[in-house]
Amino acid sequence: MKVDLYTLQENDKNENNAIVVDHISKEFRIPHERKITIYKHIAGLIRGGSYSYEVFNALRDISFTVKHGETFGIIGPNGSGKSTLLKILAGVFYPDAGFVQVNGKIAPFLELGVGFQSDLTAKENIYLYGAIMGLTRSEITSKYDEILNFAELKRFENMRLKNFSSGMALRLAFSTAIQTDPDILLVDEVLSVGDESFQRKCSDKINEIRKAGKTIILVSHDLVTIQELCSRCLLIQNGHIVTCGETNMVVEQYLKLSTR
């Protein structure tokens, strides 16, 4: 499929933008043969030398900018590279080519495991994540009750995360991320968190953060939410940019691709 690549101009690469993504690519190696034990792995090397790998190109030559105060959407089919892209923005992965420039403090809400430890309690994780985000202990303490109340987890504050349901853990992660006062919030499928009431509360909070002039990068399959919140949008498929621009135009193109 022919793709319409968005090309950065030189004046895009300045601090007027919250994020600049310049020609990044990311690939993963997938082994053709799985070795279950170290012994089998070593035996295989002795018998046959090296193993063969399939190279999976998760992202290819991705470029775009996000302005300060903008709510920017990323859409595309499952497996298109959306979550990989957010992890690169968050610093979880590094691109194999290109570069990312971030102007501001990022708070990622991607998945449990980014900044949270399953063997620690909810309380310990709140303080750990806050410290990672650069908050002092007194700053975290001042936000502590609000974090637990928003997550609706006050009575579970001394429970270890490994005993939480996935929904409880994600509620805690989202509630903590939004209270660290980030300049840039990365959100992956927030509307999958919790029940319908909590999803609406998350959506309202994102809208509140947006109106406060913060930068938000939002990945979602909920196109209505993308259209409500995002001024611009990026559509990616099979690791490539299809188009980037005004949200309604990009969503319309995505719907056309989905019906082919």
Q: PLM features: what roles do these ranges have?
A:
Residues 1-58, 247-260:
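Pre-NBD coupling/linker segments of ABC/ABC-like ATPases
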Residues 39-47, 127, 139-156:
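Conserved ABC ATPase "signature" region
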Residues 75-77:
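The feature captures the beta-strand-to-loop junction immediately N-terminal to the Walker
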Residues 220-221:
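H-loop/switch region of ABC-family ATPase nucleotide-binding domains
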Residues 226-228:
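A short, surface-exposed alpha-helical micro-motif characterized by mixed small hydrophobic
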Residues 238-239, 254:
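Conserved ABC ATPase "signature" C-loop
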